[in-house]
């Protein structure tokens, strides 16, 4: 019986709170009547609204800004158009393409190189000038395959090792510095 009284008292209390909250106008809330808005001077300092009122004002401002953005929409580009103009599609068949990548990870003599494709490639560190191949170094690559996949005997799906296949050609910075040295001597 006590549980029933508590639940009934809780609903009565919540009804009372709802009536109290929604019957009173919010302080500092603007009204639509012209006489009251005329008495407020725009240059007079506004009283700082608290809690719910300030949250409501911020939310209303965000809604107004969102509506303004919707009124002036940017031209929407279709997925087909974005795909057609993407650098990966412009590349064409990947076999024997020369690209520039950046070394982002090194494990012993394995260089993990990101060249902007779907997957990165792993190349061995060369014996000559191997100490120059550090993280962040830009290198030249010749792509062999963008994704190493294979269909195993009896399998119905391709299995990938999430890597691309490429041959490391050398450092990009050294090639750039040589061309810079040749230009002033001409």
From Swiss-Prot:
Transmembrane segments: none annotated. The modification N6-acetyllysine is found at residue 132. Residues 29-50 are annotated as: Disordered. It comes from the Eukaryota. PANTHER family: MITOCHONDRIAL 28S RIBOSOMAL PROTEIN S28, SMALL RIBOSOMAL SUBUNIT PROTEIN BS1M. Belongs to the bacterial ribosomal protein bS1 family. It comes from Mus musculus (Mouse). Residues 1-70 form a transit peptide. It is found in: Mitochondrion. This is Small ribosomal subunit protein bS1m. The keyword Heme does not apply. The modification Phosphoserine is found at residue 72. It holds the Pfam family MRP-S35. Component of the mitochondrial ribosome small subunit (28S) which comprises a 12S rRNA and about 30 distinct proteins. Keywords: Acetylation, Mitochondrion, Phosphoprotein, Ribonucleoprotein, Ribosomal protein, Transit peptide. Residues 29-42 have a biased composition (Polar residues). GO terms for biological process: mitochondrial translation. GO terms for cellular component: mitochondrial inner membrane; mitochondrial small ribosomal subunit; mitochondrion.
């Amino acid at each position: 019986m006590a549980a029933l009284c508590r639940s009934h008292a809780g609903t009565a209390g919540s009804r009372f709170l709802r009536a109290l909250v929604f019957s009173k106008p919010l302080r500092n809330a603007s009204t639509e009547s012209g006489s009251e808005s005329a008495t407020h001077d725009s240059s007079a300092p506004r009283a700082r609204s608290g809690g719910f009122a300030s949250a409501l004002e911020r939310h209303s401002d965000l809604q107004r800004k969102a509506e303004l953005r919707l009124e002036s929409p940017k031209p929407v580009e279709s997925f087909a158009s974005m795909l057609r103009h993407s650098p990966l599609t412009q590349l064409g068949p990947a076999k024997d393409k020369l690209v520039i990548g950046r070394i982002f990870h090194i494990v012993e003599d394995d260089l993990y190189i990101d060249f902007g494709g779907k997957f990165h490639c792993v190349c061995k560190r060369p014996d000559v000038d191997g100490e120059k191949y550090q993280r962040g170094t830009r290198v030249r690559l010749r792509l062999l395959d963008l994704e190493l996949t294979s269909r195993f005997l009896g399998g119905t799906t391709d299995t990938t090792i999430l890597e691309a296949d490429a041959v490391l050609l050398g450092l990009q910075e050294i090639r750039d510095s040589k061309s810079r040295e040749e230009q002033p001597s001409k």
